[in-house]
C-alpha cells in the first residue's frame, strides 16, 4: 500500500508550507512541509516544487516503518492517517507507541484512534 494523494494533502494541511527555514516550536530547524534534517540550514529558501519533493521523500520512511511494524490489514484512510502520524512523530516514536501496540493486538479501531489525541504539537 502507498500513501494516497489524499494522505499527502492531509499532511500538507496539518504542516502548512514555509519556503524559508525556521525554528519550529520544538526548537528544530525546519523547512517546507515540516522537513527537518542535516540538509536544512539557516536562511535557506526553497520552491514549492522542492517542498513537495522533500515531503514525498520524507513520507517514505514513515511508509517503511508502517510496512515493517504494522501486522494488521489497514484500509486506505487508516494507512494515510498512520503515514501522517509517523511523519509527524518519527519512526522511532511510532515503533515504541501504545498506538502501534494496540493496533497490532487487534484493539477496537476507535480505541486506537483515541491514541492520536495523546500526541500533541510541540511547544
Mark where each language-model region is.
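Active-site-proximal beta-strand/loop segments in catalytic clefts of secreted hydrolases
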Residues: 33-35, 85-87
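Short alpha-helical scaffolding segments that buttress acidic/His motifs in well-ordered protein cores
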Residues: 11, 78-86, 115-117
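Short, structured surface segments that line ligand/substrate-binding pockets
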Residues: 68-79
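Long, amphipathic alpha-helical surface segments
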Residues: 1-28, 35-64, 69, 92-123
Amino acid at each position: 500500500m502507498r500513501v494516497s494523494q489524499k494522505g499527502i494533502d492531509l499532511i500538507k494541511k496539518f504542516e502548512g508550507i514555509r519556503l524559508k527555514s525556521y525554528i519550529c516550536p520544538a526548537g528544530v530547524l525546519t523547512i517546507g512541509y515540516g522537513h527537518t534534517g542535516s540538509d536544512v540550514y539557516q536562511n535557506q529558501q526553497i520552491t514549492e516544487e522542492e517542498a513537495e519533493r522533500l515531503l514525498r521523500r520524507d513520507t517514505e520512511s514513515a511508509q517503511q516503518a508502517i510496512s515493517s511494524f504494522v501486522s494488521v490489514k489497514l484500509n486506505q484512510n487508516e494507512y494515510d492517517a498512520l503515514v501522517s502520524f509517523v511523519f509527524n512523530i518519527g519512526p522511532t516514536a511510532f515503533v515504541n507507541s501504545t498506538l502501534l501496540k494496540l493496533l497490532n493486538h487487534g484493539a477496537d479501531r476507535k480505541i486506537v484512534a483515541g491514541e492520536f489525541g495523546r500526541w500533541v504539537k510541540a511547544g
